[in-house]
Amino acid sequence: GCGKTYHSAQIILGLLKAGKRIGVSSNSHKAIINLLHGIEKAAERDNFRFSGAKKSDPDSPETMVNGCMIRDVGNKKDISSDDLLIAGTAWLFADPLFEETCDYLFVDEAGQVSLANLIAMGVAARNIVLIGDQMQLSQPIQGSHPGESGNSALDYLLKGHATVPADRGIFLDTTWRLHPDICEFISQAVYDGRLHAHHDNAKQSLLLQSAAHPGLKEHGISFISIEHSGCSQKSEPEGEIITEIFASLLRQNYCDRNGMVHAVSAENILVISPYNVQVNYLKSILPEQARVGTVDKFQGQEAEVV
């Protein structure tokens, strides 16, 4: 929640205004489309228009950007030299057709982009900008890779640093998402103490009724100890407590960072488990509208209660 997409879109917009040709890529179409939407919004705010193209699959709606300035093309040969912005996965930029055709290549979620893929598509640009957080989930890997060849692009660049050094990049140090009590723990545990919460985030809190579940707090991190044994991938005792907390949450209100009060709904809650067996069990006992999944399903998403 540090404005990665917003800042990236602003930088790309500035380069487009300067007449630079931009490439946008990532491991997934979802990540690419999210950044493209941010770029179009930034351009619309500034009344700036440009022509762009994204390599998509007409038979897969989830790959389509459906933009007002960035059109979808099924054939990469339909990308024109007039397109100041081109977007696609590594398969697009690794094609010799696009060698040295971009001034800048922006790679989103670079913590999940393999070094090999970056090298393959890097020939398309004179400059490469990596965007992401190597402390999030790493790239899925199958097989054995010698030396550092199995690293992600960000892992290779940062050489073990938890946060990017000033001489290698920009660290966005303000979260617009986390309450200060949560941010303090995350910052010290993961980000060298460099991450800080915006002051308005302190307004975010649950407005708990007197009968609320005792495991709930107005804000911050709550730990509930549950005694059980032999539950390596599925825990019914944990499921029972989660069901009670979920039901209690739906009877509460919350205050957002703007000071507005809302009723808690299932949309405001994320339930996360490391095991698919437990996820399936939780889905079977929680209301149908509950958002339940493993970490990889919800990475990058947010909710008032997790």
Regions found by a protein language model. Name each.
Residues 7, 11:
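Hydrophobic positions on the alpha1 helix immediately C-terminal to the Walker A/P-loop
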Residues 14-19, 26-34, 38, 90-107, ...:
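Conserved helicase motor core of SF1/SF2 NTP-dependent helicases
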Residues 21-24, 50-51:
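Conserved catalytic segments around the Walker B and adjacent sensor/switch elements
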